[in-house]
Curated annotation (Swiss-Prot):
Biological pathway: Cofactor biosynthesis; ubiquinone biosynthesis
Annotated gene: coq7
Record keyword Plastid present: no
EC top class, as a word: oxidoreductase
Catalytic activity: a 5-methoxy-2-methyl-3-(all-trans-polyprenyl)benzene-1,4-diol + AH2 + O2 = a 3-demethylubiquinol + A + H2O
Family: Belongs to the COQ7 family.
Membrane topology: Peripheral membrane protein
InterPro entries named in the record: COQ7_proteobact (IPR047809), Ferritin-like (IPR012347), Ferritin-like_SF (IPR009078), Ubq_synth_Coq7 (IPR011566)
Protein name in the entry: 3-demethoxyubiquinol 3-hydroxylase
Residues that coordinate or bind Fe cation 2: 84, 136, 168, 171
Amino acid sequence: MDKLLIAADNALRTLFARPRAAQPSPARGLPEGDLSPAQRREAGALMRVNHVGEVCAQALYMGQAAVTRDPALRARLMEAAREETDHLAWTAERLQALGSRPSLLNPLWFAGAFAIGWTAAQVSDAASLGFVVETENQVARHLQGHLERMPPQDAASLAVIERMQADEQRHADDARAAGASDLPAPARVLMAAAARVMTATAHHI
């Protein structure tokens, strides 16, 4: 019960409170780019997708941490979630700077990711960590695509994405080192398909 109450409190904070970063944003000190209205809209849409990804990361780690009985793994998951809070704050700042907004479907994304994390952790800690590896690898590839699509004048957003990509890859490496099992191919395919639906929807809504 305590774990569920903590998860509910974290969900409310993630979805409705202003996130506070423990580390300064990589965008700090960088000038805002001279973007056309179309470029600004596209940069905002891309950053909204990234913000959704961080909402989902929070939910995924919380769902896993609520289930695992291994204190060391729980601490590892919560530390990763704290780093994702930095990402959440940084992407929220970029959304505001670009005159954009978070996805209106964030509660839905959060609920789905929490359920996935909870379910994966019910199987085994190794499967749970395998889910982290695959998720973070997919996010890192997705961020690489955003580095290529983001208007080059938006140095602030590019700096944030580059840092996030490095952090996500490190999370994947840490999870593998902690004993992650490889997910079966059908699970990876389903995850990629779900990610495509999420990113396409969040780009607009």
